[in-house]
C-alpha cells in the first residue's frame, strides 16, 4: 500500500467496516457558515451536528475532506514550496462520533489502523495527551502498550481544542511518527520539538465539555470524537519519505511540470516546481467548487494563489501560459476520488489560461518596476512598503508576489509602511464617500422583525387574500398612519405579494379597504422575512390594524412566473450544450425580460446559442408539469437539486422540478430540471409560450450573461425581427431567405469598388499636375538632395505609406513628403527618407515639423519612415513648407 489513492481508500474502508458512514467531502466553500472563508478541516461540515443544531441519519462518519488554508488566520501560502509539509490545498482524513463512542474506542480504532492496516512499527510511534487527561494516558498504556516515556503530557492549546470562545471543547491526543536519529529533532514537548524527527500524523479530539462565558466548563451529556490526519503526511510516512513533495502524487505532478519547462526536479528550481504543483491543486479544486478569480473575497485569494504559481512558471522560463496544460495530469491523479475535477476540467483549463494570459502583462510591468526600485538594495535590506503598495494598488501586483520575488535576494518588505499606505487609501475612500443615509433608514426593520415575526407568504397558492396592517414605515421611521398622497412601506400579517429575492422582482398591485386604496409599486423583504409593501395611498387614510383586501397584479405576476421558469429551463439547456461546469451566478426575473448569469470561460457561439434556445423551446412544447415540494436541505442535495452558489438555505427548502425526466441529459428522476428555488413558477412548461434569447455577453472574468424574453415579449420580438427581415428583403429586391446571400454579394462588391477607388486615387495622386497637389507637386532640389513634396485629397494615411515607398524607389535618393487631406478637414502626413540619407535626415524630426504646422503634436516612426497628423488640413501647403525648411536647416 504505497499510493495516495490506496491510502485514502484503506482509511475510509477501515472505518466503514467499523460502522462509519463514508460521507463525501463537502465543498471548499462552506455551506451556511459565513465565519469561514474556506473549509479548512474535516469537522467543518459536521459543525452543526456537534452543536446539536443538525441531525444526521448516522452517528459515526468518516471522510477525506478537501481543505484550503490560504488567507485569514490559517494561511500557509508564503511557506509553500520552501518547506517539506506546507500546502495551500490538502486532504484531511478523519473519523467522527456524534455522541456514540468516545476515547477508548477512538484510541483503539486509531491504533489498529496505524499498526495493523498501515503496518507502522509500534516502536516508531509516540502519543501525546493533554496534561491532566489521565484517562487518555491510561488508555494509551492499556490499548497500545506504550511505555510511559512515549506517552507525553502537553499543556496549552496544542493539546486542547475549542470551537470558539464558547461551545464544545476538549483535550486532544496526537500520534507522532519518529523518523529516526538521522534527522535532527526531539519528541513533542522537548526543547528540540521544532525539529523534523518527530512528525504528527493524527490528532484525536475528545469533545467532552461545553465552555460557557467566563471560562466555566460543564461536561457534555454525549461526548463526541473529531479526528484529523493529513493524507499527505500519512502518505509520506508510509512511502518512507521525509518530505510531502516526494510522495507519488506530487512526484507525478512535478514530473509533468518539469517535462513542460525542462526543469530539474532536484535542481535549484525545485521550490518553483513545488509551488506550481501545490497551487495547481488549490486553484483547480477551488474553481471546480465554484470560486472564480476576482478582486475581492474568495476570488481574490484564488487569484493570489494562481498568480503566485504563474510567477514561478515565469521563473522556470515558461514563455506561454503553463498552468492549464497541467490540469490533465491532476485529473489523472485525483479525478477518480474527486469526479468534480473531471466534470469541471474544461472550465478549470480555460480559467487558468485566461488568468495567466492577463497576468503576464501585469507581471512584466510589476517586475520591471520592482527591479528598478530594488536595484540598489542588498541582502538584509528592506524594500519600501509604499512602493509595494503602489505595485499592489496601481498594477495589481499582490504583496505576497513582491515578497516572493525579493525572497531569493534576501530582501524583505517593510510591511508596516505597506499597511500604513493601505490605511491611508481606505481613509481617502471613506472621506470621498458622502453617504446616502440608506443604512439609517434600514435600521427600523430589525426591531420590527423581532416584534412582529415573519410575514406569512400566501403567494404560492393565491394572488388575492385578506390581511391587516401591522406596521407602517415612512422615511425610515415607524408611523401610525399614511394619508392620501403619502408614500411608505406597509407590513401586513400575511400577504400574497412576493418580496424581491432570488433574482425575482417584487410584486405590485392594490390594497383596498373601507374608504382606503393603496397602490403597491414594489414588495421587498426586510430583515430576512418581513415583507415591506412599498406604495402610495391613493384614497383615504391607512392606519395600523386596518383590514385590507390584497390583490396582486395578475398579468404582471403571470409574466414573471413565465420568465422565472424559463431561467430554470435555460440553466439546464446551457449545461446540456456547454457542459456540467455551468453554474448560476445570478439572475434578474422581471415581467418584461429575464437575465441569467453563469460560469463559462468564453463567449458562446451563435450555433451553441441556437442549440440552447432549441432545447429550451422543446421543453416548453412538452407542456410538462412543474412541481414543487418541500424537502430537507440534505435530502434535496442528495436528490440532485441544484443550488445557487453562495445562497444561504434553511433546513427545509423548496424544490422546483420541470421537464420530462426521460429527456436526454435528464437531471434525475424528479425532472429534467431540478433546483432549489423560493420563487413563483408556471403550472406547466407550456404556459411559458416561447423562449427567445436576445443577447449573450460578458459580465466579468469567467462569467457570461444571456438575456431572453418569453410569451408575449418573445412573440413581439420574433414579429419585430421578421418585419425587419421583410423590410430588408424588399429594399434588396429579394426574398427573406435570400437576404444573407444578397448582403454577402453586396459586401464583396463594395470591397472590390473600394479597392478600385483606392488604386485610382493613388494613381491620380502620383500623376502630377494641379489635380495632384498643384504647386506643391513635383520634384525639386533642397540642400543638395531631391525632395518630392505633394498634397493629395481623399487618400487614407495607410495608403500614404505605400505612396511614399513607391516614390522613394522612383527617386533613388532623396526625401518624400506627402500630406493627405481628409473629408473631415483633418490631415495626415507621411515622410520617407532613402537609406543613403538617414544619417543626415531623420524622418521622425521632419514629420514633427509638418505636424506642428497642421496644428498637431508629435509624430513617430523610424528614421526612414514616419507619420503624424493634425486637425487643420487647410495648412497642407504650410506643412510641406515646414518640411522643406527643416531639410534646409539640417542640410
From Swiss-Prot:
Gene3D superfamilies: 2.40.30.130, 3.10.310.40, 3.30.54.20, 6.10.250.550, Bira Bifunctional Protein, Domain 2, Threonyl-trna Synthetase, Chain A, domain 2. Its EC number is 6.1.1.7. Binds 1 zinc ion per subunit. Transmembrane segments: none annotated. It is found in: Cytoplasm. It comes from the Bacteria. The keyword tRNA-binding applies. HAMAP family: Ala_tRNA_synth_B. Its main location: cytoplasm. It catalyses: tRNA(Ala) + L-alanine + ATP = L-alanyl-tRNA(Ala) + AMP + diphosphate. CDD domains: AlaRS_core. The keyword Aminoacyl-tRNA synthetase applies. Belongs to the class-II aminoacyl-tRNA synthetase family. Consists of three domains; the N-terminal catalytic domain, the editing domain and the C-terminal C-Ala domain. The editing domain removes incorrectly charged amino acids, while the C-Ala domain, along with tRNA(Ala), serves as a bridge to cooperatively bring together the editing and aminoacylation centers thus stimulating deacylation of misacylated tRNAs. Keywords: Aminoacyl-tRNA synthetase, ATP-binding, Cytoplasm, Ligase, Metal-binding, Nucleotide-binding, Protein biosynthesis, RNA-binding, tRNA-binding, Zinc. Pfam families: DHHA1, tRNA-synt_2c, tRNA_SAD. GO terms for biological process: alanyl-tRNA aminoacylation; negative regulation of DNA-templated transcription. Zn(2+) binds at residues 564, 568, 677, 681. Its cofactor is Zn(2+). GO terms for cellular component: cytosol. SUPFAM superfamilies: Class II aaRS and biotin synthetases (SSF55681), Putative anticodon-binding domain of alanyl-tRNA synthetase (AlaRS) (SSF101353), ThrRS/AlaRS common domain (SSF55186), Translation proteins (SSF50447). SMART domains: tRNA_SAD (SM00863). This is Alanine--tRNA ligase. InterPro entries: aa-tRNA-synth_II/BPL/LPL, Ala-tRNA-lgiase_IIc, Ala-tRNA-ligase_IIc_anticod-bd, Ala-tRNA-synth_IIc_core, Ala-tRNA-synth_IIc_N, Ala-tRNA_ligase, Ala_tRNA_ligase_euk/bac, DHHA1_dom. GO terms for molecular function: alanine-tRNA ligase activity; aminoacyl-tRNA deacylase activity; ATP binding; tRNA binding; zinc ion binding. Disulfide bonds: none annotated.
Amino acid at each position: 500500500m504505497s499510493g495516495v489513492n490506496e491510502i485514502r481508500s484503506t482509511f475510509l474502508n477501515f472505518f466503514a467496516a467499523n460502522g462509519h458512514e463514508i460521507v463525501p467531502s463537502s465543498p471548499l466553500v462552506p455551506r451556511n457558515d459565513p465565519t469561514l472563508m474556506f473549509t479548512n478541516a474535516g469537522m467543518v461540515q459536521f459543525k452543526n451536528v456537534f452543536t446539536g443544531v443538525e441531525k444526521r441519519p448516522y452517528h459515526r462518519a468518516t471522510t477525506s475532506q478537501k481543505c484550503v488554508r490560504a488567507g485569514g488566520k490559517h494561511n500557509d501560502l508564503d511557506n509553500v514550496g520552501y518547506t517539506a509539509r506546507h500546502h495551500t490545498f490538502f486532504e484531511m482524513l478523519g473519523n467522527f462520533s456524534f455522541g456514540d463512542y468516545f476515547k477508548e474506542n477512538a484510541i483503539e480504532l486509531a491504533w489498529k489502523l496505524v499498526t495493523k492496516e498501515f503496518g507502522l512499527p509500534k516502536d516508531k510511534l509516540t502519543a501525546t495527551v493533554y496534561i491532566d487527561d489521565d484517562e487518555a494516558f491510561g488508555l494509551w498504556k492499556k490499548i497500545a502498550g506504550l511505555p510511559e516515556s512515549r506517552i507525553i503530557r502537553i499543556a496549552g492549546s496544542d493539546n486542547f481544542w475549542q470551537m470558539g470562545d464558547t461551545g464544545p471543547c476538549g483535550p486532544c491526543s496526537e500520534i507522532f511518527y519518529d523518523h529516526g536519529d538521522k534527522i535532527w529533532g526531539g519528541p513533542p514537548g522537548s526543547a528540540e520539538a521544532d525539529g523534523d524527527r518527530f512528525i504528527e500524523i493524527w490528532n484525536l479530539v475528545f469533545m467532552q465539555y461545553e465552555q460557557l462565558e467566563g471560562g466555566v466548563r460543564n461536561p457534555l451529556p454525549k461526548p463526541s470524537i473529531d479526528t484529523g490526519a493529513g493524507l499527505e503526511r500519512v502518505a509520506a510516512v508510509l512511502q518512507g519519505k521525509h518530505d510531502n513533495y516526494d510522495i507519488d502524487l506530487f512526484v507525478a505532478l512535478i514530473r509533468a511540470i518539469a517535462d513542460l519547462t525542462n526543469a530539474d526536479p532536484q535542481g535549484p528550481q525545485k521550490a518553483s516546481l513545488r509551488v506550481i504543483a501545490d497551487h495547481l491543486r488549490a486553484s483547480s479544486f477551488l474553481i471546480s467548487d465554484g470560486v472564480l478569480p476576482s478582486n475581492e473575497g474568495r476570488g481574490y485569494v484564488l487569484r493570489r494563489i494562481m498568480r503566485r504559481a504563474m510567477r514561478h512558471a515565469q521563473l522556470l522560463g515558461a514563455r506561454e501560459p503553463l498552468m492549464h496544460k497541467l490540469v490533465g495530469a491532476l485529473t489523472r491523479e485525483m479525478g477518480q476520488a474527486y469526479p468534480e475535477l473531471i466534470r469541471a476540467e474544461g472550465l478549470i483549463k480555460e480559467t487558468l489560461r485566461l488568468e495567466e494570459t492577463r497576468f503576464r502583462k501585469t507581471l512584466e510591468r510589476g517586475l520591471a518596476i520592482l527591479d528598478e526600485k530594488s536595484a540598489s538594495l542588498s541582502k538584509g535590506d528592506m524594500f519600501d512598503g509604499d512602493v509595494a503598495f503602489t505595485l499592489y494598488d496601481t498594477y495589481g501586483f499582490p504583496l505576497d508576489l513582491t515578497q516572493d520575488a525579493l525572497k531569493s535576494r534576501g530582501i524583505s518588505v517593510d510591511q508596516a509602511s505597506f499597511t500604513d499606505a493601505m490605511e491611508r487609501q481606505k481613509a481617502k475612500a471613506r472621506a470621498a464617500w458622502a453617504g446616502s443615509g440608506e443604512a439609517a433608514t434600514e435600521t427600523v426593520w430589525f426591531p420590527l422583525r423581532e416584534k412582529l415575526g415573519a410575514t406569512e407568504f400566501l403567494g404560492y397558492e393565491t394572488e388575492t387574500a385578506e390581511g391587516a396592517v401591522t406596521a407602517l414605515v415612512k422615511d425610515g421611521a415607524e408611523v401610525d398612519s399614511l394619508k392620501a398622497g403619502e408614500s411608505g412601506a406597509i407590513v401586513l400579517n400575511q400577504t400574497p405579494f412576493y418580496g424581491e429575492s432570488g433574482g425575482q422582482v417584487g410584486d405590485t398591485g392594490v390594497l383596498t379597504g373601507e374608504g382606503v386604496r393603496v397602490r403597491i409599486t414594489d414588495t421587498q423583504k426586510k430583515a430576512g422575512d418581513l415583507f415591506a409593501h412599498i406604495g402610495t395611498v391613493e384614497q383615504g387614510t391607512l392606519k395600523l390594524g386596518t383590514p385590507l383586501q390584497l390583490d396582486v397584479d395578475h398579468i404582471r405576476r403571470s409574466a414573471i412566473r413565465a420568465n422565472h421558469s424559463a431561467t430554470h429551463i435555460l440553466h439546464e439547456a446551457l449545461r446540456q450544450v456547454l457542459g456540467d461546469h455551468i453554474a448560476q451566478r445570478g439572475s434578474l426575473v422581471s415581467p418584461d425580460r429575464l437575465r441569467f448569469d453563469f460560469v463559462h470561460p468564453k463567449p458562446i457561439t451563435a450555433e451553441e446559442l441556437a442549440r440552447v434556445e432549441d432545447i429550451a423551446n422543446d421543453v416548453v412544447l412538452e407542456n410538462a408539469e412543474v412541481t414543487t415540494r418541500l424537502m430537507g436541505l440534505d435530502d434535496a442535495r442528495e436528490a440532485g437539486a441544484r443550488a445557487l452558489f453562495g445562497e444561504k438555505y434553511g433546513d427545509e427548502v423548496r424544490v422546483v422540478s420541470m421537464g420530462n425526466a426521460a429527456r436526454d441529459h435528464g437531471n434525475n428522476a424528479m425532472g429534467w430540471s431540478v433546483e432549489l428555488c423560493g420563487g413563483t413558477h408556471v403550472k406547466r412548461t407550456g404556459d411559458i409560450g416561447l423562449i427567445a434569447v436576445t443577447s449573450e455577453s460578458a459580465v466579468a472574468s469567467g462569467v457570461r450573461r444571456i438575456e431572453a424574453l418569453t410569451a408575449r415579449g418573445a412573440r413581439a420580438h420574433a414579429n419585430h425581427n421578421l418585419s425587419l427581415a421583410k423590410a430588408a428583403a424588399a429594399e434588396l429586391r429579394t426574398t427573406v431567405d435570400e437576404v444573407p446571400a444578397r448582403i454577402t454579394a453586396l459586401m464583396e462588391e463594395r470591397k472590390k469598388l473600394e479597392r478600385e477607388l483606392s488604386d485610382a486615387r493613388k494613381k491620380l495622386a502620383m500623376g502630377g499636375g494641379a489635380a495632384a497637389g498643384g504647386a506643391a507637386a513635383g520634384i525639386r532640389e533642397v540642400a543638395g538632395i531631391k525632395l518630392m513634396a505633394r498634397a493629395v485629397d481623399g487618400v487614407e494615411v495607410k495608403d500614404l505609406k505605400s505612396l511614399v515607398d513607391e516614390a522613394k524607389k522612383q527617386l533613388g535618393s532623396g526625401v518624400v513628403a506627402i500630406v493627405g487631406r481628409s473629408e473631415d478637414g483633418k490631415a495626415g502626413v507621411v515622410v520617407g527618407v532613402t537609406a543613403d540619407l538617414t544619417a543626415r535626415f531623420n524622418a521622425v524630426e521632419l514629420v514633427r515639423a509638418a505636424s506642428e504646422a497642421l496644428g498637431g503634436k508629435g509624430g513617430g516612426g523610424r528614421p526612414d519612415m514616419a507619420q503624424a497628423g493634425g486637425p487643420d488640413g487647410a495648412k497642407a501647403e504650410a506643412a510641406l513648407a515646414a518640411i522643406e525648411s527643416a531639410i534646409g536647416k539640417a542640410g
